[in-house]
Amino acid sequence: MYMQVESRTGTLLHLKRNPSIRSWSLLVGISSVGLAAAYYSTDTWLWKLFYVAGCAFVALQNLEDWEEAIFDKKSGKAILITYSLYKKLLTLCKGGQEQVVVLLKEIRDVNVEEERVRYFGSGYVIVLRFVTGISHPLTQSAVLGARSDVEAVAKELTKFLEFDLVGSRPQAVEESNDSESDEALDTQ
C-alpha cells in the first residue's frame, strides 16, 4: 500500500504511510541473525552484545520511515512529515522528524513517476510539481509493483486540490481565445 487516506473532509486531506511488511521482515530477519550469532557463539558476553547491537543497527537502517501528508485548505498549506526511528535513536530522541511546509497555491501539478529501486526493479512515487519548477516527492520511498495504488492516491489528491477543474478551465479559455483570433484573422 502506498499511502492510506487517514481522514478526508472538504478542507482537509490527511494521508499516512507506515513501514511495509517487507521492511518489517528485513528488521526481524537481520535481528534474528544477530541473536543467533550471539546464542550459538562461544565468545564472551561483550562480543555477543556486539553481534546483537550490530545487527540491530543494520536492521534499523533498513526500516522504512513513517510518513504523513496533510493538505489543509483552511490554512492554505501542505505539510509533509517524515519520522525515522533510526535517526531518532542516533540523535538520542532529539531528531528523527523532518517536515516540509509548502503553500497549496504553489502546487501546480501532481504526477505519478516511475523510479528505479536498487535490486528490486522499478517502483512508483507521487511527485508534486510547484510553480517555481521544483519537484518534490510526496514520500521518500517508492512502492514496488502496484502502480494502481499510487495512481488512486494521486487521483484523490488531484480531486482534493481541484486540479481536474482548474486544468479544464484554462484550456477552455485558450480555445476561446484561439477562436477569437481566428475570427479576427478571417475578417482582415
Curated annotation (Swiss-Prot):
Localization, UniProt: Endoplasmic reticulum membrane
Topological category with respect to the lipid bilayer: Single-pass membrane protein
Keyword Transmembrane in annotation: yes
Taxonomic superkingdom: Eukaryota
GO BP, sorted A to Z: innate immune response; respiratory burst after phagocytosis
Transmembrane segments: 20-42
Gene Ontology cellular component terms for the protein in this record: endoplasmic reticulum; endoplasmic reticulum membrane
Keywords, alphabetical: Chaperone, Endoplasmic reticulum, Immunity, Innate immunity, Membrane, Transmembrane, Transmembrane helix
InterPro entries: Cybc1 (IPR027846)
Family in the record: Belongs to the CYBC1 family.
Summary of the function given for this chain in its UniProt record: Functions as a chaperone necessary for a stable expression of the CYBA and CYBB subunits of the cytochrome b-245 heterodimer.
Entry protein name: Cytochrome b-245 chaperone 1 homolog
Organismal lineage: Eukaryota, Metazoa, Chordata, Craniata, Vertebrata
